[in-house]
């Protein structure tokens, strides 16, 4: 399992990262995506089909299914249950990408990719409802990779160093800086 998550509310680029991981890893693996399916009106485990309604499965899982029709896409609010169902119903799947699952402690991914918004540094943020943090910054020790998104085109080296110092808690962690191009 590769988990793509964050510790804040709001868009940090998890879905575009999930799409990039699926596109790359599908060359070597039979990949599935597991999402909670935010905004859906249903509960429990559902597989996303090309003709699924976004109200039933969520807009982002449907978007991914339409973009990657050969990828198994499922939604389940209980991620451990969702992983078990995917494995049972699709024994050929050998890699599951878990979208927005960093807070789910019942699952221990092989790789945790944590997305960080450069415009909202975690060291200056507070827990909900006073801020945008939905997990403690101390939990970042579980991350393997940090992808800092929305970086300015010319990010100062000192700003990169400060972010690395804030984020890296154990020696194996790596930080990557990205920006959107229009």
Question: What is the predicted role of each segment?
Answer:
Residues 33, 73-75, 177:
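A structural preference for short, hydrophobic beta-strand core positions in alpha/beta folds
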Residues 175-182:
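Beta-strand-loop-alpha "switch" segments that mediate conformational coupling across diverse proteins
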Residues 30-32, 112, 175:
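Hydrophobic anchor at the start of a short beta-strand
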